Amino acid sequence: MATLTAKERTDFTRSSLRNIRTSGHVPGIIYGKDTGNKPVSLDSVELIKTLRDEGKNAVITLEVSGEKHSVMVTDLQTDPLKNEITHADFQVVNMSEDIEVEVPIHLTGEAIGVKNGGVLQQPLYALTVKAKPKAIPQTIEADISSLDVNEVLTIADLPAGGDYSFNHESDEVVASILPPQQQEAAEVDEEESADAQPEGENEQ
């Protein structure tokens, strides 16, 4: 388990937040049932490295004022122009209790239906997973190699983990292969809708 060191914040002015960020640190907050809300700041490079190495759903040891907490990142705010993390939320977790988190789906393989001219549709990109913190997967892999035209991949088809469960209906669609003509018809309908103009009131 990776360990990060954070400092407790007592100054909440805008100038203080600006100074934290310009010094290469990220303001954040650590919260939990028995912890309350505790504003903190931590090294930006170390945070990015930890998330890259461990994954966003990893359990991290966050040390604040000599006290260690098992936490997970629940929210990251970023500046898209500077590509920087501007704020981070850390939730204290009980390692023996189940929690629910969003886990991304990663489709693997090339579907037979796509090779035959079909079009891959993926309506679901993340799953709500329930598990103890250490058992949460970083991604859920779904093999679509055998998926043919007019076939669907549902929650029931995903590999079940003995240590976690999905908080979804079993028939919820993860991916499907549309016939080429169905995709073309949908595109034509969209074009016709865009080109349609309402009739003028004074038109003879």
Curated annotation (Swiss-Prot):
Record GO terms (molecular function): 5S rRNA binding; structural constituent of ribosome
GO biological process, any: translation
InterPro entries: Rbsml_bL25/Gln-tRNA_synth_N, Ribosomal_bL25/Gln-tRNA_synth, Ribosomal_bL25_b-dom, Ribosomal_bL25_C, Ribosomal_bL25_long, Ribosomal_L25_dom, Ribosomal_uL5_bac-type
Keywords: Ribonucleoprotein, Ribosomal protein, RNA-binding, rRNA-binding, Stress response
Pfam families: Ribosomal_L25p (PF01386), Ribosomal_TL5_C (PF14693)
Function recorded in the entry: Not required for exponential growth; probably functions in vegetatively growing cells, maybe required for accurate translation under stress conditions.
Protein family membership: Belongs to the bacterial ribosomal protein bL25 family. CTC subfamily.
The protein's name: General stress protein Ctc
Species whose genome carries this gene: Bacillus subtilis (strain 168)
Species lineage: Bacteria, Bacillati, Bacillota, Bacilli, Bacillales
